[in-house]
């Protein structure tokens, strides 16, 4: 069903660079501006896709081998508020909160990686927020880190910091210890142009990609969960084509992440059982 959706419906709003990359591999750009993906193209890209991926930590003892039946647990999300257990109040999250969370994860044996769990709301400049997010995560733990970038223009400056932490670009490329959590689609079945350009920059810089599709059943995805999953799989398969058309075998993780909407209010139900 997901392959049928890619072949017949396709995805809209790819950036110009993405259109060139994917049509060069065999995707078809329709007169309606949508990219469609023949079944054979998807199968070919899946054959090229990386299999036994290692997510490196700055300390090798925290390396994560993503193969076989191995299962790992970590943080996720981008919370903008936090419950302050000392002051007993609900407030905006800060850079210090992010650092504290990274330190906590570092000392929890059964939490294996740290994705940026909250937004540094006390840093108002977006570039400074991105670079302080990266620094706060890596300062708090030597486990593998996942982060995001709020604008494609911020990627280069953040990589200056990454190369500094790694001891040089060559050492970074040998053991990339940060991955890009990338919501490259805006469901239903549309690319997120700026996120795609960010993803391209991260691929060129050697950073693993977590391909995230976060549709909401009943809002940006069909209400029946089975069809919401079909949509999420189709969107992430489009991401696999995108990544491997650009850099065959580049480490990328299939991140279907369907949520559900509260149909009484229209709000996202982030902690729902459906997720």
Predicted segments with their positions:
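Acidic/polar, glycine-rich intrinsically disordered N-terminal extensions of enzymes
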Residues: 1-96
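Helix-rich catalytic cores of soluble enzyme domains
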Residues: 93-275
């Amino acid at each position: 069903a997901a392959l049928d959706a890619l072949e017949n419906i396709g995805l809209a709003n790819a950036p110009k660079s993405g259109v060139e990359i994917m049509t060069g591999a065999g995707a078809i750009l329709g007169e309606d501006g949508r990219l469609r993906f023949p079944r054979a193209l998807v199968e070919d890209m899946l054959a090229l896709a990386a299999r036994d991926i290692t997510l490196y930590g700055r300390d090798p003892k925290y390396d994560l081998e993503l193969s076989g039946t191995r299962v790992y647990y970590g943080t996720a999300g981008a919370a903008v508020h936090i419950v302050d257990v000392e002051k007993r109040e609900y407030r905006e999250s800060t850079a210090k909160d992010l650092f504290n969370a990274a330190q906590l994860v570092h000392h929890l044996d059964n939490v294996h990686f740290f994705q940026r769990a909250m937004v540094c709301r006390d840093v108002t400049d977006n570039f400074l927020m991105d670079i302080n997010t990266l620094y706060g995560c890596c300062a708090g733990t030597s486990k593998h880190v996942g982060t995001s970038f709020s604008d494609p223009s911020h990627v280069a400056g953040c990589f200056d910091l990454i190369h500094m932490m790694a001891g040089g670009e060559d050492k970074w490329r040998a053991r990339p210890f940060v991955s890009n959590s990338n919501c490259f689609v805006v469901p239903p079945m549309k690319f997120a142009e700026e996120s795609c350009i960010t993803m391209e920059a991260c691929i060129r810089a050697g950073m693993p990609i977590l391909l995230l599709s976060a549709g909401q059943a009943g809002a940006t995805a069909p209400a029946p969960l089975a069809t919401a999953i079909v949509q999420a799989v189709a969107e992430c398969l489009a991401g696999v084509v995108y990544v491997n058309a650009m850099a065959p075998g580049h480490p990328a993780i299939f991140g279907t992440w369907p949520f559900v909407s509260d149909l009484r209010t229209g709000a996202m139900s982030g902690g729902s059982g459906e997720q």
